[in-house]
UniProtKB/Swiss-Prot annotation:
Residues that bear Phosphoserine: 79, 86, 97, 105, 517
Function, in words: May be involved in intracellular vesicle traffic. Inhibits ATF4-mediated transcription, possibly by dimerizing with ATF4 to form inactive dimers that cannot bind DNA. May be involved in regulating bone mass density through an ATF4-dependent pathway. May be involved in cell cycle progression.
Upper lineage: Eukaryota, Metazoa, Chordata, Craniata, Vertebrata
Source organism per UniProt: Homo sapiens (Human)
Note: Depletion of TXLNG by siRNA decreases the percentage of Hep-G2 cells arrested in G1 phase.
Name this protein carries in UniProt: Gamma-taxilin
Name of encoding gene: TXLNG
Amino acid sequence: MATRVEEAARGRGGGAEEATEAGRGGRRRSPRQKFEIGTMEEAGICGLGVKADMLCNSQSNDILQHQGSNCGGTSNKHSLEEDEGSDFITENRNLVSPAYCTQESREEIPGGEARTDPPDGQQDSECNRNKEKTLGKEVLLLMQALNTLSTPEEKLAALCKKYADLLEESRSVQKQMKILQKKQAQIVKEKVHLQSEHSKAILARSKLESLCRELQRHNKTLKEENMQQAREEEERRKEATAHFQITLNEIQAQLEQHDIHNAKLRQENIELGEKLKKLIEQYALREEHIDKVFKHKELQQQLVDAKLQQTTQLIKEADEKHQREREFLLKEATESRHKYEQMKQQEVQLKQQLSLYMDKFEEFQTTMAKSNELFTTFRQEMEKMTKKIKKLEKETIIWRTKWENNNKALLQMAEEKTVRDKEYKALQIKLERLEKLCRALQTERNELNEKVEVLKEQVSIKAAIKAANRDLATPVMQPCTALDSHKELNTSSKRALGAHLEAEPKSQRSAVQKPPSTGSAPAIESVD
């Protein structure tokens, strides 16, 4: 019998789970709403568990008192079971709150979020219909299981065993509920810690954004300064090139003038050289002529000497002739001397002309030296300009190096920005993982709450069965009214016991689902 009751409860729980899963697919709540609903439901479950512990002892005493009366009422058993099953359904309709019914109907009907909520009367009617269907099936299964037993003692023994099992299960469920409450408190603490870390990450993000903005502003100022410096350098370079071009043009004009003057001087020098050559040739010709004259005079002297020798021989014979010839020769000698002096004077004049030509040549050399000095000064100015140009080129190289350094700094800042963006993305990924963990924990909590509600319904059904058996045992109306009050208490207590019973499969599921949660624990540690 106990196995059949458990199978019926499992079938009821499977249907409720399917309905809740369908309700989840149709309607989703925000994490904050789920958290608030879960805390309220857990508070209600805790209260029901306390009431169940208080009522367990009173129910056991009532069962012992009514054993004798139940033994006598076996004849009217079947009719009373059917009547009390319907009465129990109607009583449970009144006990279930309309809000719970609406919530259960929303969870069972997929896509109920999109529909508008009907009025309270329609909600009650729908809840009652659903309850009649589910509870009627379970009551019929329990009654069939009890009908298989022959004697009422066996039925009572089976019910007592089932009740003891339910008590043990309720205690275990209470323990599990305490463990789950502790886990929930830990999860809430972790959630608060994660929220604080999220706020810290947002602050860090805002700081990084402000730093990026400051860097962009600094980069803009650096770019503007570099552009201004480049413009100033270009203006300076243009001015220097213009000044250099003007000086080059002036120097070229001076060089052209000097070339023209040098050409004139060269022509004059060529003409003077030709004149000097002509004078030298004339002087050479005159020297040759003078040499010839001297040779001729030497020959004449030789002839005179020969004549003198002859005359010496003929002195004696012709002293008169000799004297005459001597006078004649003296005259010729004086004439030749006069000619010699004239030739000397001509030579002096020619030497004077040569000195004049030499003076002119020296003046030409002085003019050439002056032109060379001007050329050297021009070369010095050119060297100065080249030095200035080299200095300007060095300055441009320095500015280029500064600009390259600034570009390198900008690239480094951009790399740092990319690294920080990667860190920010990693933090976002960690936050998404933590949000997934929170969602998974919330879904587990919702599943546990739904299972607790299913167990509550099972306990209420079992309480209805016990109340039906008690009504069969008591023929008098007064004990029946007392039993009704006990039934109401039993329903509340057995709901709590049902919550404990549902917590066992949930704990098993959580144990099955713990590996992914433990896998997510290193992610939380990495965030810390």
